[in-house]
A protein has these predicted regions:
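Auxiliary tRNA-acceptor-end handling modules of aminoacyl-tRNA synthetases
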Residues: 53-56, 60-73, 95-273, 278, ...
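Conserved lysine of the Walker
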Residues: 301
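Short beta-strand-centered segment that lines the nucleotide-binding/catalytic pocket of NTP-utilizing
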Residues: 314-332
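Hydrophobic positions on the alpha1 helix immediately C-terminal to the Walker A/P-loop
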Residues: 304, 308
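Glycine-rich phosphate-binding loop used to anchor ATP phosphates in small-molecule kinases
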Residues: 356-414, 464-478
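Conserved nucleotide-sensing/catalytic segment adjacent to the nucleotide-binding pocket
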Residues: 329, 333-375
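Conserved NTP phosphate-binding and transfer environment spanning the P-loop NTPase/kinase superfamily
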Residues: 286, 405-553
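Hydrophobic anchor at the beta1->P-loop junction of P-loop NTPases
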Residues: 291-293
Length: 553
């Protein structure tokens, strides 16, 4: 008699019996599900697995397609492998580095003995399409870590060797596409034919690889020129090359050799130098009366504002900070979102006419009565402090809409200095596994929310997609308006956040939907050596999340 087990499918809320050892693909077909953009992977007991995963016990299963962030990650990783194989096929002695998430794509540094040309981009794109058209299986293997290390040593992949050496895992998974072998952090597609849409084009001196978005998997994300952000990444990468710490494996090796404090001190000094240079630029730029600072959640904007204010004072400029929260319109006039809830992230939740009227008056030397928003009554009250700017004063305005031209539409551009601040993670796991900048910020937020706001990691993870949607709508479209960009990420920070983040993430129960993301983040953290945060200076930006800052928040 054939042995069977029970599978509960979250997609259609049905339960079926399937043979023991069935793959997720076989389970999917048994449920007779239809997904236009999938399945690409599945959550098995709230843990993401590839579709070739076999089930040997009763499980809860939720199949994922390209409408999910996890599904897009699986698709993107698989496309990275196709790209790496295509380049390897055409240029056997080449090197590919998946380097920078930028311009709604991924910048790839391709070393092929000469600068990448349009013809190279065309050849690589055609070779990728050929690999996809051949419907090649992407096979999943498991070996002892020692065997995997020997294999990658023979392949000359030192970045992977360094990464795996420091993990301490007994076994390691890897993937094979035809004759090409690689390691990827997370689930993969099972066949290249599942890749329906991608773009490859020459970008600066490399390639830009483009993928569909979860919002609309039927089309590629529109190209956005993010030259300023690209340059920020490039500057940090050059600095990391000088230090010899380009990947997590390099970092772990440096920690093992006793250079942790050096990495912390240099990272902090670099940030302070950038802030000092920015303050000097503001002080020396004639006519600047307001500094506008925007950036996504958990970028460390509050500490950045305080450190910038200190440096401005050393330049003879006295900053005056104004909170945009005090410019909220009355709650009854606040726009609502698609669910009917008040949308406080909407630009028009702010009293734009009053902002422009008062800023104009201040720059003319007039005294104004600032508003004060009463969060209990939901009313704007003219009970704030009275303010008149002196000649050496400059306003500091921080908020999600600070770079939106509509916020200060009546203020002349020469009076503004705009800064975009975000945690732009520049260290790589290895050459083919980049670190999403959103992971850095989410880990910061999980630690801060638990420590200071009484929120569990489960709550923070649950709200994160809504936070990201607001950023995509209100912040990212205006980031290239900035006169300067400041990278708040630091080379060592994940290692310092690790202990506190792991402790909070381990509290997320397996039975909840957020467990999949918590598990993914725990796996990500496992790649890093752990560092104590005692040696951080009291002005460190990370103190905003970890505590112990000399600034008052």
């Amino acid at each position: 008699m054939k042995q069977v087990l029970q599978i509960r499918c979250k997609n259609n809320k049905k339960t079926l019996e399937v043979p023991i050892g069935s793959t997720l693909y076989e389970v999917y077909r048994a449920f007779n599900l239809k997904m236009d953009f999938g399945p690409v992977s599945a959550k098995v007991n709230n843990k993401v697995e590839g579709m070739n995963y076999q089930v040997f016990q009763n499980k809860d299963v939720e199949f994922l397609d390209l409408h999910s962030a996890s599904g897009v990650r699986t698709y993107t990783r698989s496309l990275f492998m196709v790209l790496c194989k295509a380049v390897h096929d055409l240029y056997p002695k080449s090197k590919v580095v998946i380097d920078i998430p930028v311009s709604n794509g991924y910048y790839c540094n391709i070393s092929i003995g000469h600068t990448v040309t349009e013809n190279d981009a065309t050849r690589i794109r055609q070779q990728m399409q050929s690999i996809i058209d051949r419907a090649l299986p992407i096979r999943h293997y498991e070996a002892t870590t020692e065997q995997a290390l020997n294999m990658f040593r023979e392949l000359g992949d030192e970045a992977k060797v360094k990464l795996l050496e420091n993990m301490g895992s007994l076994y390691t998974t890897y993937y094979k596409l035809d004759d090409y072998v690689d390691y990827y952090y997370g689930s993969m597609l099972t066949n290249t034919s599942q890749i329906k849409l991608f773009g490859v084009e020459k970008f600066f001196d490399g390639l830009l690889l483009r993928v569909p978005s979860a919002e609309n998997p039927a089309k590629l994300d529109d190209f956005i020129n993010q030259g300023k952000m690209f340059e920020v990444f490039r500057v940090h990468h050059r600095w990391q090359e000088i230090l010899g710490v380009r990947t997590v494996g390099d970092f772990n090796e440096a920690v093992k050799q006793g250079f942790a404090n050096d990495l912390i001190n240099v990272s902090e000094a670099l940030q302070e130098k950038k802030i000092s240079q920015m303050a000097e630029t503001i002080a020396n730029k004639e006519g600047v009366r307001v500094v506008l600072i925007a950036g996504p959640s958990s970028s460390g904007k509050t500490t950045f504002c305080k450190r910038l204010s200190v440096q401005l004072l050393t330049c003879g400029v006295k900053p005056v900070q104004i909170s945009l929260d005090d410019y909220f319109v009355n709650r009854i006039d606040t726009p609502k979102d698609e669910t009917g809830e008040y949308d406080y992230e909407n630009l028009y939740a702010l009293n734009i006419p009053l902002i422009n009227e008062q800023f104009t008056a201040l720059f003319q030397g007039k005294e104004v009565q600032l508003p004060s928003y009463n969060f209990q009554t939901g009313m704007s009250e003219m009970k704030g402090k009275k303010l008149r700017l002196k000649p050496n004063n400059v306003l500091i305005v921080e908020g999600i809409h600070a770079l939106n031209p509509m916020l200060t539409k009546d203020i002349a551009d020469e009076k503004k200095f705009r800064i975009y601040a975000s945690a732009l993670t520049t260290i790589l796991l290895d050459d083919h596994n980049y670190i999403p900048t959103t992971d850095n910020r989410l880990i910061r937020r999980i630690v801060r929310d638990y420590k200071y706001r009484g929120c569990s990691a489960q709550d923070t993870i649950r709200r994160w997609p809504s936070v990201r949607a607001g950023e995509k709508k209100w912040i990212f479209p205006y980031q290239e308006n900035a006169d300067a960009m400041f990278n708040t990420a630091m080379l060592y920070e994940v290692a310092v956040l690790k202990a506190q983040a792991e402790a909070v993430l381990e509290q997320v129960p397996e039975k909840c939907d957020e467990y999949a993301e918590a598990y993914r983040l725990r796996k990500f953290l496992s790649y890093f050596a752990s560092l104590p945060f005692r040696s951080l200076p009291p002005t460190s930006l990370l103190r905003e999340f970890l505590g112990g800052s000399s600034f008052k928040y």
